[in-house]
């Protein structure tokens, strides 16, 4: 497919009767640079937001080499594009088979969880691995999000400390994570997290 200066030009020229991707690679480049210049922490691209190979390659080309993956298919996609990218399996509900394959077949060491049951699955599926990086996802208020996920994922704050202590016994690195909800438009939500 060709390049077009605007979406209108594409529509007028092709008159498609099927969905069309309009990828603005320069905008991706600018966005990655903005993040890198303004965010002091590690930047992970959440593959589920858009698993298009061209987009992922552009993100990699601009210096992002760590990815939030939510499924084995996303892990396989990243392995195909950049086998040495660092992957973080951040979905809190995973099958033992997915955990095992992620760990043994693709070298994923970083996993998110929000329950003792998920910790047990991770430990069993990795044969009690000693090099795990575990992230306890804590449920926070999603009051400013279009889609509130606070009741779906995350350990309750009252249970989180015990889970963090338990994970400390089984992890090389330990962290916490939270999700402010989908389409969150208020930066205060990040401060509350």
Model-derived regions, located:
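A charged N-terminal "starter" segment
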Residues: 1-132, 165-172, 188
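Short acidic/polar capping segments at secondary-structure boundaries
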Residues: 93-95, 116-119, 139-143, 181-183
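Active-site loop/helix belt of alpha/beta enzymes
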Residues: 125, 140-193
């Amino acid at each position: 497919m060709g390049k077009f200066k605007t979406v209108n030009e594409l529509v007028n020229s092709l008159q498609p009767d099927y969905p069309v991707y309009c990828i603005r690679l320069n905008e991706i480049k600018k966005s990655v640079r903005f993040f890198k210049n303004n965010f002091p922490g590690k930047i992970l691209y959440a593959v589920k937001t858009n698993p298009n190979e061209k987009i992922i390659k552009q993100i990699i080309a601009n210096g992002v080499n760590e990815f939030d993956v939510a499924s084995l298919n996303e892990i396989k996609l990243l392995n195909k594009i950049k086998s040495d990218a660092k992957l973080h399996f951040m979905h809190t509900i995973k099958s033992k088979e997915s955990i095992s394959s992620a760990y043994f077949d693709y070298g994923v060491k970083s996993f998110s969880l929000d329950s003792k049951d998920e910790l047990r699955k991770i430990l069993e599926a990795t044969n009690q691995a000693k090099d795990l990086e575990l992230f306890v996802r804590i449920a926070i208020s999603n009051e400013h999000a279009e889609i509130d996920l606070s009741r779906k994922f995350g350990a309750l704050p009252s249970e989180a400390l015990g889970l963090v202590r338990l994970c400390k016994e089984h992890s090389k690195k330990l962290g916490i994570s939270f999700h402010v909800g989908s389409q969150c438009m208020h930066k205060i939500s990040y401060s509350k997290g």
